[in-house]
Each structure stands twice: as C-alpha cells, then as structure tokens.
Amino acid sequence: MFQGSSALTLDAKGRISIPTRHRDALMDRAEGRLTLTRHPDGCLLVYPRPEWEEKRAQIAAFPMSARALQRLLLGNAQDVDIDGSGRVLIAPELRNASGMTRDVMLLGMGAHFELWDAASLARREAEDLAQGMPDVLNQFSF
C-alpha cells in the first residue's frame, strides 16, 4: 500500500523519478509497469498495471449515463514503464490536461497514486480545508 507525499520535479523531457520507497514495491508488484490517466479533480492517477486492469474492467462496465467519465478515464489512459533510472515519462497530453509545470507532488493513496501540479494541489487543499471536515469524519477519531 502506498502512502505519503513526495515533492518531485519534471525534467526537461517530462519525466519524474519515482521515489525509492515506492520504486521497489512497484517493481515487485507490477514489474515497473504503470498506467496513468486523468482524474476529474485535475490530477493524474498512477496505477500499478495489475490494479489498473481491475479498475479498467470496472470502468468499462459503467452504464451509458457515465460515458463522459469512461471517456475521461479510459480514453486518456497511457501505459508506461519505469526506466532503468527509476523514471517515468508523463505524456505531454496528460501534463497539459492536468496543468503540470515543473514542480509536482506524488501522493500515495493506498493501491494507487495521485500526481498533482504542486501549486494546484496547494490551492485544492486550501479550498478543501476551508469547507470544513466532511460528515464521515464525525465518527472518526484521530
């Protein structure tokens, strides 16, 4: 399971270096094979390929009323591999769609990651905190 955040930098070719603490697990779990796609919140989702295969089947089975979401998730999905230096290429289409510039944040979200433009994530977190805690946390103790 993946957790925690990592501040990363896109290189001139649009690649990020996967943090070592995640790289080994991704190599063991998915042989370094990942799938990236867009998320409605404006970030990119990064899945180890085996987990993505399960999600892809679930998304493909959505009813016609969810066609726009299918188009966003499946139509933008791109398979990538971690290279020998531990880097992953983020396609220009995905970088542009998510507003990624140079500084990005990789967030471990359990079985997958979210990849955000750093400034966009900071704005989003500030907006989310300003709205207060969701009701689901009323029964949760930290």
Swiss-Prot record:
- Kindly state the subunit structure of this protein: Forms oligomers.
Q: Where is each SpoVT-AbrB domain found?
A: 5-51, 77-120
Q: Which family does it belong to?
A: Belongs to the MraZ family.
| GO MF annotation: an example | DNA-binding transcription factor activity
Task: State the UniProt keywords alphabetically.
Answer: Cytoplasm, DNA-binding, Repeat, Transcription, Transcription regulation
Q: Which organism is it from?
A: Bordetella pertussis (strain Tohama I / ATCC BAA-589 / NCTC 13251)
A Gene Ontology biological process in which this protein takes part is: negative regulation of DNA-templated transcription initiation
Q: Where in the cell is it found?
A: Cytoplasm, Nucleoid
Q: Which HAMAP family match?
A: MraZ (MF_01008)
Protein name per its UniProtKB record = Transcriptional regulator MraZ
UniProt cross-references to CDD domains, sorted A to Z? MraZ_C, MraZ_N
One GO cellular component term of this record is: nucleoid
Taxonomy, superkingdom:
Bacteria
